[in-house]
Amino acid sequence: ISDKILLDVAKITKKFYPNSVTDDFDVNVEQIENIQFKSKVKFGRNVLVGKNVKIGSNCLIGHNSIIETNVSIGDNCTIGSNVIIRNSLIKNNVHILDGCIIGKKGFGFFPDKKANFRYPQIGVVIIEDNVEIGCNSTIDRGSLSNTVIGKNTFLDNQIHIAHNVKIGENCIIAGQVGFAGSSV
């Protein structure tokens, strides 16, 4: 039937999720009234918020941060300055420090002699309760499944979590660590 089953699945998936290969940037300042947020949410200067965003109560979104499409942020969360988040479910008491990028597409390619094919990234990032993510860390959204950071986990600065990675509960991970795609 096919000697490149994963490549064929990727091509079929792309047809159903055409925007999963390119990050369409549809964030607009005027959309801020369309978001759903509870009481006591504070926004820093130059914050942009996209479509389908929910923000819980007692949250702080730092200066110059971008909350793109399809993001849900729980209660008592802090998003630092210069953070970009998209396609993510962030639960309660989560602290994302300055400069992080959460939920962008991962590094998923199928090599082919004609041309490399980017695998669609249709999963999300799930960050469980009581998590802290250090400065300048990156967490890719899942390709066909989700990327998950377990409860009570602390990530130091400059950590990279690739697509589909599952980090367990109560983990403490030191700086400059990288997890390759689909690691558990």
Located regions from the model:
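Short, basic phosphate-binding NTP loop
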Residues: I1-E33, S39-G44
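Structural signal for interior beta-strand "rungs" in well-ordered beta-sheet cores
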Residues: V29-V184
